[in-house]
Design a protein with these regions (language model features):
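N-terminal carbohydrate-binding accessory modules
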Residues: 1-39, 69-73, 77, 176, ...
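Short, well-ordered coil/turn segments that N-cap beta-strands
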Residues: 1-3, 36-38, 72-78, 128-133, ...
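The substrate-binding groove and active-site-proximal loops of carbohydrate-active enzymes
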Residues: 11-22, 46-62, 99-114, 141, ...
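Aromatic-rich peripheral "rim/lid" segments of glycoside hydrolase catalytic domains that contact
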Residues: 16, 115, 282, 286-408
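Short, acidic/polar
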Residues: 17-33, 115-123, 192-205, 272-282
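Aromatic-lined substrate-binding rim segments of carbohydrate-active enzymes
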Residues: 22-97, 157-186
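Active-site groove signature of glycoside hydrolases
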Residues: 41-46, 83-111, 115-158
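Glycoside hydrolase catalytic-domain groove-lining segments
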Residues: 158-166, 170-265, 289-290, 299
Length: 408
């Protein structure tokens, strides 16, 4: 199993792409490598890469390549998110899709042409770098279609389930065309698993891309429901992975825990190391789990204003590069994590019912529901993660779904 970090630059956060200091980047990567981590996930900003639909800036692409090569100096593999998009509550959208040029990010043909142009040029550059392994479409890009109460995007791009499918196939297909040997992913927040009418569905998650990604955050629902210190917080990432396995018709489908972190809203400093070790211990036996990527590498500086409070302290390192207790705990666990072996789950699964095609009914899996509470109780009683199983529902047959999954 690979263990890495989502790279948040210690100097200037993602605004550092404006005037890249490659020496500062090297210092960050040196610290990450000294912990024993083996990969980083990078987030160049879409408006800087492509300020006009017809202009993908060569200098901006050069900067991405420079950072990839700097990571390679410390034997770190790299994946790159293309359309960023959305990061830590802030949207980074180019001027040609907002305000007077407001356009639908998922259905407008001109916008999609611009997106594929950027992805194509970025993939063409990255495929030449030996430590670059692949690309994610963008960080939690489906949040631009979010419509759940409290999560409804203020300038939402409406789309249907079929529109979402077409958009994903177009973006991922462009990556494959330009980088045949690369690996490609679709990253999303957990609304996809829990919101019945979200146009991006679990079916998309488990059939699109090289592996199913999971983003595990306890600050939204699990923490508020169960409270600080409850076992549900450290079991939640495993629950999401089991949910991903339940939706997939392909038993060989790989999994990537692309984001998991310790928000201080529900994990105080005094518990951060224990949260790390307990969370990781729950993950080691997960069938198909090939990588875990902690969010994030470095704390956000307090000099940067107006972030949600929890965003300032999610790093493995302080902004000055000092490893925090959870970083040291992770480093100590690396031999066990690298050698982790999946365990067969022989117990009867906990079943739920939802529609394979549309995702309708998926809200039964929400952390606010009975299924999750029952799953956590059973995990605590047995010390093992229970399986989940999706009951047969109207939609594709198992044979058709498996063929679709393997085709993508």
């Amino acid at each position: 199993m690979k263990i890495g970090a989502n790279y948040t630059p210690s100097q200037g956060w993602f605004h550092s792409w404006l005037d890249l200091d490659i020496d500062a980047t090297r210092r960050d990567f040196e610290g990450i490598a000294q912990l024993g981590l083996d990969h980083v996930r990078l987030f160049p900003l879409w408006p800087l890469l492509q300020p006009n639909r017809g202009l993908v800036r060569p200098r901006a692409l050069d900067d991405v390549v420079s950072v990839v090569r700097a990571a390679g100096e410390f034997d770190l593999e790299v994946t790159v998110d293309a359309l960023n998009g959305h990061l830590s509550s802030y949207d980074f959208l180019p001027s040609w899709v907002i305000t007077w040029h407001t356009s639908n990010l998922f259905t407008d043909p001109l916008v999609k042409a611009g997106q594929t142009d950027l992805i194509s040029q970025l993939a063409t550059r990255l495929r030449e770098e030996p430590n670059a392994t692949g690309m994610t479409v963008g960080n939690e890009f489906p949040q631009y279609a979010a419509l759940a109460p409290g999560h409804h995007h203020p300038t939402r791009s409406e789309c249907t389930v079929d529109d979402a499918q077409t958009w994903l196939e177009t973006m991922l297909g462009t990556m494959r065309d330009q980088w045949p040997d690369g690996r490609f992913w679709f990253g999303f927040d957990d609304d996809l698993w829990f919101v019945d009418d979200h146009p991006f569905t679990p079916r998309h998650a488990v059939t699109q891309g090289s592996a199913t990604t999971v983003h595990s955050w306890v600050f939204a629902q699990v923490g508020p429901r169960f409270g600080e210190g409850h076992p549900a917080l450290t079991w939640f990432p495993r629950y999401l992975l089991e949910l991903a396995r339940a939706w997939s018709h392909d038993p060989e489908r790989p999994l990537w825990l692309q984001e998991v972190g310790a928000p201080r809203t529900h994990v105080p400093d005094s518990s951060s190391a224990a949260f790390m070790t307990t969370t990781m211990a729950s993950l080691t036996s997960t069938p198909g789990l090939e990588a875990i990527t902690w969010w994030c590498s470095h704390d956000v500086s307090r000099d940067l204003l107006d972030f949600p409070e929890l965003e300032y302290s999610l790093g493995l390192f302080t902004k000055d590069g000092k490893p925090k207790p959870e970083a040291l705990a992770l480093s100590d666990m690396l031999p066990d994590l690298h050698n982790a072996q999946p365990q067969h789950q022989l117990d009867e699964p906990l079943e739920f019912s939802a529609n394979w095609d549309t995702g309708a009914g998926r809200s039964v899996c929400s952390p606010m529901g009975d299924l999750f509470a029952q799953w956590v109780d059973q995990a605590e009683q047995t010390g093992r993660a229970p399986r989940l199983a999706l009951r047969p529902t109207p939609g594709l047959t198992d044979r058709e779904a498996l063929a679709s999954a393997r085709a993508h």
